[in-house]
A protein has these predicted regions:
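Extracellular/virion structural assembly segments
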Residues: 1-208
Length: 208
């Protein structure tokens, strides 16, 4: 029989949520320091990557089976899946509209968007997440739309334009945002006790 390969990225099981998480961004910054003057030179490379560790709640084997099947299907670090910050699934800002990218070929840490209600304040607040195409960004400053419903939004990390093209009128997601991740380890392990309660955790990094 032919080998079966799942269609990646996979979607998380919904049988349970996450109990705890450690979620953050890892950067590649080189620092050299003179041994004589202690003066430093700093260079920020393009590499920036979301990383996370998720611990699931204790669960019975029927629920655990769905999670284990999902994790097995990733085949270690081979497969990918969609996930985001599980504690920040909605924004703090006032935006409710369909928001679009305003202009193609945008790069760096700022992106022009439109579709906001004209002159609306705090459409996004610092710390909100937005998703453009497959990737996740955090808004780094409060955003107010101008009289045309347009705004420049400052984000971290830089736009992933070297990985995915960001086209004009691309829809911007700001609820249940995710990025694409893969497991950090090729080993999959879990804990059980005498009453078949399972403990499952996994670590992952953004797929770039």
């Amino acid at each position: 029989m032919a080998a079966y390969t799942p269609s990646y990225p996979l979607t998380l099981p919904t049988v349970t949520g996450v109990r705890t998480q450690n979620f953050g961004l890892s950067r590649v910054v080189a620092v050299t320091q003179s041994p004589f003057t202690n003066q430093q030179q700093v260079y920020e490379h393009e590499g920036a990557q979301w990383k996370a560790t998720f611990t699931l709640p204790p669960m019975k084997k029927e629920s655990a089976a769905q999670w284990l099947a999902f994790l097995m299907s990733l085949r270690g670090s081979r497969g990918t899946f969609k996930i985001g910050d599980q504690d920040r699934k909605t924004i703090q800002g006032t935006a409710t509209e369909t928001i679009l990218v305003n202009g193609a070929a945008q790069t760096g840490n700022a992106i022009n968007l439109d579709g906001f209600t004209a002159s609306r304040a705090n459409v996004f607040l610092a710390g909100d997440y937005i998703q453009i195409n497959s990737y996740l960004y955090m808004v780094s400053a409060n955003v107010t739309a101008d009289g045309s419903g347009e705004a420049t939004v400052y984000v971290e990390p830089s736009l992933r334009t070297g990985i995915e093209a960001i086209n004009d009128n691309t829809t911007v997601v700001y609820t249940n945002t995710t990025t694409i991740m893969r497991l950090d380890s090729n080993e999959l392990n879990w804990d059980t006790d005498k009453v078949s309660i399972y403990g499952i955790s996994f670590s992952c990094s953004e797929s770039l």
